[in-house]
Amino acid sequence: YNIVRKCLSYLHIPYVVPYDKLDWVVGFDTVFSIGGDIYTLASNGSYNASLPLFLEQLQQRGIKYILWGASVGKFEENHLALRFFSHHLSKINLIVSRESNTWEYLQSLNLNANLCLAPDPAFLVKNPVNLVPEQHEGIIIGINLSPLSALYEYGSIEEAVAIQAEAVIRLIERRGCEVLFLPHVLSPDKSDNDLLYMKAIYDKLPKNFQDKIMIIDSDPGFVGLKRFIVKCDYVIAARMHCAINAITVSV
């Protein structure tokens, strides 16, 4: 497949590999796809069919497919995507939507038979023992910013960094606060790496504002990040799961 795809790339012909090796699925009855990021358009309006087609291959082997904790759509800006996903989603054995926007959108596509609504699974993750908000002087605001979401709003990382750096300056000036940068996703893909993105914002700031900011520059994991979140009075989050992390520790 890789050879075929490479050859076609020289001809500028896109080729989607629909599935990988399937030996590992022998003996399984059900496969869960957790989260809904693959069921949205990219910031440039494109879509990737690789994983959905792979999951359809599993269904052809008699394995049920459940999409759990999903946010889906919208696809109207890309008619090919709308047609593909409308057909694909109708095949899924169960779609568990995590919020009402997805619920209403899928109903508008007449996808009612295999649809239900339930809280995001992140709400059920157990907190570390005795994890309670810390008492301190002054205001600490935790901020999570995502290059992925910024691309949807601004179109380029450079523009987003400049605009959001200015927003951080205004926040510190008006609230007289300290800021804790909370990266949620650390990815090899720079366009999806919160830490690299927030470091770029930090580097844009004047020194006197940098002195009021601390960056979590490690990867403590989903649960480990809660220990930093409880230091905050408020959290502003681009990533849904970072926001849920804050809610579940009463911030």
Please state what every model-predicted region is.
Residues 1-251:
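Active-site anion-handling motifs in enzyme catalytic cores
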